[in-house]
Structures are given as structure tokens and as C-alpha cells.
């Protein structure tokens, strides 16, 4: 998964700040805008830098004329195959590119895993013991992991934070087991919840986003999912957290300090006008680099 792809190539994350527009490159990208006058965000790779001034002017016009404007259609000059830019406060799409076409969501899937786990009502201090039979398949598949070991006892909170900050497949597999008994049952739960949210072109097969041809979504559906996730106070706190230390146990006497992957990747790309709040990255060979994120502007921003 994405944590094993640390180098940034031409299709990796690249950022440009021109005037008031934040431009971020990824293979599939969605940013949720949370204030009326917030600058628009969009996928962009370094190869498109020469065209950004024209694009910027068009996007700013789209963001300041909600009554007359229609979503800006991003062209093939933007390397990202899928994009969806949404002003949540006004419930208005600012720009999109193939926003309703199917794509592989990779670890953005873990937003749904987080939401269902937080909605389960399970106590944060509920213990969970890892076993080798669960961890070995994840290692074989090359899934990103927090680093939990066989026979290690952790808490439900550790699993929640580990699933997002470290994008840990070990944490998400454990969450699926705790919430629904096994991952297959949890995937059915994920699909039912997706229908409830109006994610009608999404189908989940697993809790982590490991590639499967039948595991797909759209940029629009991921936007809906992120909005709903942010309405949950616990989910929002986790998605906005920079650093977390897991509980102490016999395997890790001092706990493990885990840091937000998405924040580490975004730390060099912070515009003055917009405050990046958090989100979820993703990567598989089939999906490419992915990002679902949210930002706010102003000291008293609108939105959830």
C-alpha cells in the first residue's frame, strides 16, 4: 500500500501555489471545501505547470459565482484521471474530472472502515489481541501495517488511529473483526452503509483497500463518504490528528508513536490562505496515488 511507496516520482505528490489556488498532484484526488470563499483545490502534476494560470482564473471564477456557474471541467492537461472539488457549505461542486466514473479507491477505503467502527459504539479501551494467522496474509499481500505483532494486546482506540495515521491494514482487519466478526461480514456492512449514504457506484470487498477488481468507487462517492465521516466527532478528531502513541503493552512497553502519513506528505504544501485539516491517502499499482482531504479557511469556518 501507499506507505511502502515513499519516493515521489513525477506522478507522486507535487504542489504549486499560484495566487490563491492550491494545486496538488495525485492519481485520484478530492478535496472538500468548507467555506464560501475558500480557494479551489484540484489534482495537478508537475507536467501541467505551464497551464496553471489559465486554469486558476477559470476556477476562481467558478468559486465566486455560485448562482450562474457550473462545475469547471478539468482537461487532460491535468494529469490526475479523477478529481472532485466540492464546497460543502454551499453544497456546490466547483470542479471535477471524471468525478462519477469508477476508480479504485485504495486506502481511501479506510474512511468507511473508520466510520463504521466509530458508529459501532464499541468502547475505546476494548482490548484486542493480534494473532499470527491474521497478520501473515497481510504481510504476504504487501499491505501497509502499523507494526502490531502476534500476541500483542492493543485497544480499540489504537486500532482506529492506526488505521488512519499509519494506514495500517493490520488495524483495519482487526476493526472488521471486532465490529462484525470477520472481514467478509464487515464488507457487507460497508456496502449497506454506502447505499445509505448515496454512494450508488461504490462496492467494497475488504476493509483496507487492497486491490480487487470488484472493489471500486468514484471521486464523487468518496466526497460523500468524507463529508459523512467528518460529521462524526471521533472520526474528525482522528483524521485531524498528527501524532498518536499506542497503549503500552508487553510487546511495546512504551507504546508506538505513529504519525499521520497524509500530514507528512502535505507538510511542504501549506498555502497561507487555506488551512489543511487532514484526510486519507492511498496507493496501489492499479489505483495510483490517491488523496481525499479537507481544508478550512478563516478563524470561524463554516461547515461541520
Q: Whereabouts are the PLM-identified features?
A:
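N-terminal Lys/Arg-rich, disordered targeting/topogenic segments
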Residues: 1-11
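Phosphate-binding loop of NTP-binding sites
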Residues: 4, 48-50, 55-56
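Active-site-adjacent loops and short helices of periplasmic peptidoglycan-processing enzymes
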Residues: 9, 37-44, 55-220, 227-233
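Hydrophobic alpha-helical segments, especially transmembrane helices
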Residues: 9-11, 21, 35, 111, ...
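Penicillin-recognizing serine hydrolase domain
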Residues: 13, 41, 70-71, 76-80, ...
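Hydrophobic membrane-insertion alpha-helices, especially the h-region
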Residues: 15-27
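Hydrophobic single-pass membrane-insertion segments
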Residues: 27-41
